[in-house]
From Swiss-Prot:
Cofactor(s) it depends on: heme b
Subunit and interaction comment: The cytochrome bc1 complex contains 11 subunits: 3 respiratory subunits (MT-CYB, CYC1 and UQCRFS1), 2 core proteins (UQCRC1 and UQCRC2) and 6 low-molecular weight proteins (UQCRH/QCR6, UQCRB/QCR7, UQCRQ/QCR8, UQCR10/QCR9, UQCR11/QCR10 and a cleavage product of UQCRFS1). This cytochrome bc1 complex then forms a dimer.
Family named by the database record: Belongs to the cytochrome b family.
Annotated GO MF terms: metal ion binding; ubiquinol-cytochrome-c reductase activity
Keywords assigned by UniProt, alphabetized: Electron transport, Heme, Iron, Membrane, Metal-binding, Mitochondrion, Mitochondrion inner membrane, Respiratory chain, Transmembrane, Transmembrane helix, Transport, Ubiquinone
InterPro entries named in the record: Cyt_b/b6_C, Cyt_b/b6_C_sf, Cyt_b/b6_N, Cytb/b6-like_sf, Cytochrome_b, Cytochrome_b_C_euk/bac, Cytochrome_b_N_euk/bac, Di-haem_cyt_TM
Swiss-Prot/TrEMBL GO biological process terms: mitochondrial electron transport, ubiquinol to cytochrome c
Cofactor binding note from Swiss-Prot or TrEMBL: Binds 2 heme b groups non-covalently.
Chain sites annotated for binding heme b b566: 97, 196
Note: Heme 1 (or BL or b562) is low-potential and absorbs at about 562 nm, and heme 2 (or BH or b566) is high-potential and absorbs at about 566 nm.
UniProt name for this protein: Cytochrome b
Function text: Component of the ubiquinol-cytochrome c reductase complex (complex III or cytochrome b-c1 complex) that is part of the mitochondrial respiratory chain. The b-c1 complex mediates electron transfer from ubiquinol to cytochrome c. Contributes to the generation of a proton gradient across the mitochondrial membrane that is then used for ATP synthesis.
Result when mutating residue 104 to D: In strain: Isolate MN 48041
Amino acid sequence: MKILRKNHPLLKIVNHSFIDLPTPSNISSWWNFGSLLGMCLVIQILTGLFLAMHYTSDTTTAFSSVAHICRDVNYGWLIRYLHANGASMFFICLFIHVGRGIYYGSYVLSETWNIGIILLLTTMATAFVGYVLPWGQMSFWGATVITNLLSAIPYIGNTLVEWIWGGFSVDKATLTRFFAFHFILPFIIAAFALVHLLFLHETGSNNPSGLNSDSDKIPFHPYYTTKDLLGIFLLLLVLMILALFFPDVLGDPDNFTPANPLNTPAHIKPEWYFLFAYAILRSIPNKLGGVLALVLSILILATFPLLNTSKQHGLIFRPVTQVIYWIFIANLLVLTWIGGQPVEYPFTTIGQIASITYFTIIIILIPVSNTIENNIIKL
């Protein structure tokens, strides 16, 4: 078996990626989230496939088909809630994964980092089109509001919106194409994830100390496969608790009402994992400005490798930037809270302050703290 896995053309790739891969001996549990994301993707594709067997992408029957899945299909309720809450687990793992990358300076591996940003954007797009499919009130109005933002693009905006809608409003054509996108995008994510791994294994993994670990590597299997399995079991435990005991805790009550174009919900808001970006969008009174801020809130992650001037790798020995980092995380939580609040004082003001803080920390405060710490080292 040993000879086969080292010589077989296909098994050799698996062997070099998951078995004999030289890995730093000191990577902590924060490095588990890559494998957890892979697990989440597998769960989402499998549950999604079974849901697609019973779902109909037609405005007249979409809502009923979801109710049919929950009521009449064997364990349909479980598959549906695993899929819905699996998306939340996916984004929790994603945000922790990105946060770990920022904290430990993984962005210096720029190819891996940039593919990761593409993965984040693609996952957000997949989740958005998926949220439209149950065709509840929040699905319909969320789709209307978010797609309508494209009309802010000069010259081609209105044409682009009608092209995406497939008509003059969100209707059957929109639902059908969103279902098609939602079906194909996870497989594109899987392909990008392989490219992400390919680039990571070109350079080798980062480690908590931020020091070169070439002299202290251990094989991935059995050490980290066992460690990853523990993480996967814990993830599945949390997911099952969510799906079985609190299936609707992260959903919106408005989505239990079928879509009605004549009745607007009091507060239109996306799923919790988009609230931080939604708060940034709403904090700018100008439509085009809001859309640009929304896009930049994610794309700004690409500036981390460019703005990094620190002589040290990661934040483990950098107390000044550590403080700024945790302020940044707290600020993100504030943005998430504000995104779910109505558009009125004092929430709008708090949202504007938090949005300015978000960009200021990344563009100004972190580079300044890098310079301060570099000068402290010279003393």
